[in-house]
Every structure is written in structure tokens, then in C-alpha cells.
Amino acid sequence: MSSLPELQASALDPQALLEQLDRQLPRPTGYWVAFSGGLDSTVLLHLLAMLRPRLAAPLSAVHVDHALQTDSVAWAEHCRRVCAALDIPLHSLRVDAMPRQGESPEAAARQARYAAVAQILGPRAMLLTAQHRDDQAETLLLQMFRGAGVEGLSAMPVVRSWNRGWLARPLLGVRRASIRAWAEARGLNWVEDPSNMAGVADRNYLRHQVIPAIVARWPGAVDSMARSAAHCADAADMLRSLADRELRDVSVADRLEQARLKSRPPARSRN
């Protein structure tokens, strides 16, 4: 599913998004925008609001207050006003995102957020998040530095099964600069999370220090990294198919046959 066509930066318009939702993604019982109030989710929400009469399912938004920033209550109110102006139902949630020992604040917030949202989405609902191509490049680099294989280097898929339905990222083929330009051209307002500027988090360090230096030397690097992630996703799909076939070949009566398994080349056994 990660190799589905992506909405391209040159096609950041409602019609292109509608085609992706209608023809390339599963048909859900409802579309739910994960709306933080930030730039990316604001653009996604407005794009979908323009499409609402033509969507195959009802459109709603969900905002999660992690209670990690002093302005979080104001951000929730901002999201309420935006959704009210667009006449989009908004579900506001508040979670305890305090990290456990050894857990990063970002990981704790992400886990709490998805757990809370999962509680209110029904079967076959689709959660839409606003990650874009620059986020994909950051994810690829983070996985590379962790020594990931092709599964991890696939980075983020356009759509995957999640919580009795799906999680989709319809802007994954769009550059951050295109999203900002679209928002500014339409006079949209959004909130700025100061934690996104802090250099302590690994992703922020990549975003503000590493990737700009890479792009200064190789201007097409972000697009190239996205292509590499797509190649890895294809390779991961093939390896999963191979592993399924190998498992059948080395199994007898639903049990692994050790002799057959050991006869395989090491790389195929590890797979």
C-alpha cells in the first residue's frame, strides 16, 4: 500500500486530492482530519472542506490537547473556531502525555494521541494526517541512523490499516514549501508550536540543521529520499511475499522443520 501514487506538489488542489481519495484509497465510513491547528493540518482541513459536497463519506475533525504547552488551551479554542467557520464537526480530546522513564516526550505524545483518537473512531473510518514529503525525508534519515532494514527505510506509507479502519497521509507527496505557499495565498491562520523549533528533538535537529545543509549541496535530495523510501517499500512487499512462501516450504503440519530452515541461505532464513 505504501507504493500508491501520491498527491504531487504541482497538484496541490482540491481536485487532485479528491481523485486520490476517491480512486486510490479505500472507501471509509467517515473521514477524520487529525487537526492540530498547525500549518499542515490547517491546509489539509481546508482542502477537504472545499471537497466536502463531493466526498464519499462524512467529514469530521479531531483535536488532541496533550497539555504539554502553556498555550494548548488556546490552540484548542483556535481549532474550535476554525472548524465552526467551516461547519465541520470537531471532537476535542485532552490526554495525559507525560513520558515514562526512557521515553521521549514526542513518543509519549504520539502514543497518547493515537490511543485517544482510536476510542472515538468507528469501524472502517479513515484518519487523515498531514505529513508531507519533507517529513518523509526526516523519517527515512531517522530510520537509517537506527540501522533499519528495508521495512523501516520504507518510512511512512500513504495508507495503512489502523484501528478497524485506515490511517492515510494524502499530502505525503507534497513539499512543505508548497503547503505554506498554498496557505499564505489564501490568508489562512494557523498556530505555531514552539517545540517544533527546539533543536533537542532528533527530528527538529534534522529539520533545521541537517536537511538544509544537504539540500544546499544536493537541491533534489528531499525528492530523491522519498523515491528511495518508495523503492524500499516495494522491496519490503516482495520480501514479505517471499517470507510467506518460505514459511510454507519449511513447515510441516503447521510446525517449522528445523532441517529445512537451516538449509536456506542465511539471508533468507533471517527474512
What is each model feature region?
Residues 2-212:
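Core alpha/beta nucleotide-donor-binding catalytic domains of modification enzymes
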Residues 201-271:
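ATP/NTP-dependent adenylation/nucleotidyl-transfer catalytic domains that generate, transfer
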Residues 1-2, 268:
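Intrinsically disordered, low-complexity segments enriched in Ser/Pro/Gly/Ala and basic residues
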